[in-house]
Amino acid sequence: MSASSRGAALLRSQQRSICLQCRNQTRVLAPAGVTSAPRRFYSAEASATATATATATTTTTLPPPHPPVTTSTGTHAATSTSSQIYRIKSGVILTRPPLLTRDLTPFEESFYFYQKRLNERLTAPFRKDFYFKKDTAADLDWRIKLKERHGVPAKDIGRYNPRGRMAWNDEVLVGSQTSSRKHMVEKLLADAEMRVSEDGEEIPAEDRVPVEKPMPRRTEADEKGDVKRLDRALDKTLYLVVKKKADKEGEEAKWMFPTGVVPTDEGLHETAARILAESAGVNMNTWIVGRVPVAHHVVRPVFGQKDGALLKKGEKIFFLKGRIMAGQADLTDNLHDLVDFKWLTQEELRSTLAEEYFHSVKGMFAER
């Protein structure tokens, strides 16, 4: 008998849980006239290990069989499957992107102002003869304004001469308004006024044509706090939220994104587009960005405390992102019992939406 056969026979003989058929088969497979070699342990350690192995083998019992599957309604897991206790819903997070760049920080204003002064030091001197014909109205107007700027061609860098002996001192002092946006706009508007008429005569201050000023960054809606208008918070993203009135089951009125149940014959993006039209009307030019959800919210089902019966189904809501390009929301004749709507910024959503609801969707919000 080979070494491998003797080892296999040794292991089988030590296992008492082996059936008699396998034991007899092992004995029959042994060649006639060949007796099993006596056990030889080459060290005391090997002998102790074999004894411990044999003891552990004899005391090992087989695991019990799997318990039968029951249909009892006593536990939540056995009550229903996930598809029976949850409703699949689709929602749309309709956004209006920022229309203006954000306000600069004081550090950024100082940095850009420093770059303007540095540029005046490094560039070639301004050649007015190339732009203004001598003794014309434009040339006279340029001379008047250049004198008011103390000989500095640039209009928005303050009293700074990049060619003088103090050209190295190109940083503004702390607290100075020279680098502020408001100060620069005032200087540029004042310089844009024409001081000389076509006849070469200086125009009095009361007869000068005022330059049209740019629109303010804060609109009338910002001043009044009107959260239903789209022309507010122009430097931030706005999100459409709607308020659903309290239902008969005792659920309180709450703010949320337009949401509805997904039927079996629609995809998530199709349901989102339909729900938006049914909730906020069709007087909006909107666009659903892609067919993949950008956020996910789960509402747990409600079970009875005594018998574990399902009292209220849960919800799994998948949100898709949308853009509005024109129009306005209109809740008239909506099909989802909505009573109000708002266009809110990310900071305003935090205080309006429920905490868990906001936590589920905050990952898709834009930076501003």
From Swiss-Prot:
Transmembrane segments: none annotated. Keywords: Mitochondrion, Ribonucleoprotein, Ribosomal protein, Transit peptide. One of its GO terms (cellular component) is mitochondrial large ribosomal subunit. Pfam families: MRP-L46, NUDIX. It is found in: Mitochondrion. GO terms for molecular function: structural constituent of ribosome. Residues 53-81 are annotated as: Disordered. Residues 69-81 have a biased composition (Low complexity). InterPro entries: NUDIX_hydrolase-like_dom_sf, NUDIX_hydrolase_dom, Ribosomal_mL46, Ribosomal_mL46_N, Ribosomal_mL46_NUDIX. Signal peptide: none annotated. It comes from the Eukaryota. Component of the mitochondrial ribosome (mitoribosome), a dedicated translation machinery responsible for the synthesis of mitochondrial genome-encoded proteins, including at least some of the essential transmembrane subunits of the mitochondrial respiratory chain. The mitoribosomes are attached to the mitochondrial inner membrane and translation products are cotranslationally integrated into the membrane. Belongs to the mitochondrion-specific ribosomal protein mL46 family. Component of the mitochondrial large ribosomal subunit (mt-LSU). Mature N.crassa 74S mitochondrial ribosomes consist of a small (37S) and a large (54S) subunit. The 37S small subunit contains a 16S ribosomal RNA (16S mt-rRNA) and 32 different proteins. The 54S large subunit contains a 23S rRNA (23S mt-rRNA) and 42 different proteins. This is Large ribosomal subunit protein mL46. It comes from Neurospora crassa (strain ATCC 24698 / 74-OR23-1A / CBS 708.71 / DSM 1257 / FGSC 987). The lineage of its organism: Eukaryota, Fungi, Dikarya, Ascomycota, Pezizomycotina.
